[in-house]
């Protein structure tokens, strides 16, 4: 491994998403701003596509100037979607050429690839640049698509993705989201630096005064059960509606709040199926800056994900955000490190199975937890200790960067999170 010269670290962060996507706004830019403040010069390459109307529509020039003020230089390429495999090849070629040119021109030290395709671009560019490459592993991609029903195990795309993954382990450093992923992917001691960095929350977004959401959604005096995030088969939308139907039989004041960028029809159809009246739920897209107000107005949080092998590498963003809002979390089992954290930190309830009896048991336990003195503060303490964007997320990224560069690491990271059984 070639050591980085003694000067400010320079990184090119490659992200195969649009800057305007909510995921990039909440799970990429805050980390890059933190790394910039820590002394790293940052370039960001995104792949842009046509934006849905509910995403930000501010012109590129405004965003480019804003990011430059944060110490981030923003580069863009066009995202191609069809036909699927040829489009990916075009993006990989275009991305590799752009990365090579940028790294050479700006004397960049580290190419940071977020997920498989971005890391592949970095590794293809490495022989032409001499830069070090980070593979930021966001999950077990091939297995995830098979479990979601999008791919068939053994299909061409599945086999290509598995081959690419093996190639990606030639990277110089790695990020994984969970302890379980680290144990599965790197069972032996690795000579290469690895950091476990879960999806974190930005405490600054939770420090602002929260508006009265209960009145706005017609839920004053109700027990609000909140679900934030994607909908669909992977996220057990049918089971979410079934759970709420059971909760209503126990607490007639129960009210379901769903904040999602998915089609509201997905959950509305399921609520209609169970006979839930419209007065007992609210479904809306909530921009990231307003989400804390909605979560802090709630009482109990739901995190439902279809179990499967790929989920051991998953770190749901909503989990950190729920805890930051002081909420007990009801979750399916087998999702990343959540089982161990919920059990050991006592911040929620794990569903035994997806049955009415299990739903009733979990709701009663969560309802009792939220009423315990000091429970909300205990949840917030866990959130700050284990998922703080600055003291955990950014600090661990900088630890990885310094390990790659051979620089001393002055950053103290709190490792005391109960993520093992």
Question: What kind of feature is each model-predicted range?
Answer:
Residues 1-63, 242-251, 414-421:
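N-terminal subdomain of nucleotide-sugar transferases
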Residues 22, 235-238, 284-294, 301-320, ...:
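Nucleotide-sugar-dependent
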Residues 91-94, 129-134, 142-167, 203, ...:
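Nucleotide-sugar donor phosphate/pyrophosphate-binding loop at the beta->alpha transition
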């Amino acid at each position: 491994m070639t050591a980085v010269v003694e000067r400010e670290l320079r990184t090119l962060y490659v992200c195969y998403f649009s800057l305007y996507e909510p995921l990039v706004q909440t799970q990429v830019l805050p980390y890059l701003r933190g790394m910039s403040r820590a002394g790293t010069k940052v370039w960001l390459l995104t792949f842009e596509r046509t934006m849905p109307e509910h995403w930000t529509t501010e012109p590129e020039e405004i965003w480019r100037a804003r990011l430059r003020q944060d110490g981030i230089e923003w580069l863009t390429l066009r995202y191609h979607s069809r036909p699927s495999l040829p489009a990916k090849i075009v993006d990989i070629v275009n991305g590799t050429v752009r990365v090579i040119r940028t790294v050479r021109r700006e004397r960049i030290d580290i190419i940071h690839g977020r997920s498989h395709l971005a890391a592949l671009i970095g590794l293809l560019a490495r022989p032409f640049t001499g830069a070090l490459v980070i593979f930021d592993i966001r999950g077990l991609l091939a297995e995830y698509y098979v479990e979601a029903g999008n791919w068939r195990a053994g299909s061409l795309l599945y086999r290509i993705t598995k081959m690419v993954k093996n190639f990606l382990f030639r990277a110089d450093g790695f990020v994984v989201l969970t302890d379980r992923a680290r144990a599965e992917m790197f069972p032996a001691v690795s000579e290469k630096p690895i950091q476990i960095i879960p999806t974190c929350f930005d405490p600054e977004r939770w420090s602002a005064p929260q508006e009265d959401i209960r009145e706005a959604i017609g839920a004053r005096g109700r027990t609000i059960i909140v679900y934030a995030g994607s909908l669909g088969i992977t996220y057990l939308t049918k089971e979410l509606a079934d759970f709420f139907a059971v909760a209503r039989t126990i607490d007639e004041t129960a009210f379901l709040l769903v904040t999602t960028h998915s089609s509201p029809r997905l959950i509305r159809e399921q609520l209609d199926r169970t006979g839930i009246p419209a007065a007992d739920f609210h479904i809306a897209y909530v921009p990231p800056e307003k989400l804390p107000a909605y979560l802090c107005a709630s009482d109990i949080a739901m995190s439902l994900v279809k179990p499967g092998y790929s989920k051991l590498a998953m770190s749901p963003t909503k989990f950190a955000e729920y805890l930051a809002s002081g909420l007990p979390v009801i979750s399916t089992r087998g999702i990343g490190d959540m089982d161990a954290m919920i059990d050991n930190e006592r911040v929620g309830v794990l569903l035994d199975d997806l049955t009415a009896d299990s739903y009733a048991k979990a709701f009663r336990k969560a309802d009792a937890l939220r009423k315990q003195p000091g429970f909300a503060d205990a949840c917030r303490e866990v959130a700050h200790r284990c998922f703080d964007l600055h003291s955990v997320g950014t600090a661990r990224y900088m630890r990885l960067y310094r390990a790659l560069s051979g620089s001393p690491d002055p950053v103290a990271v709190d490792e005391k999170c109960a993520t093992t059984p």
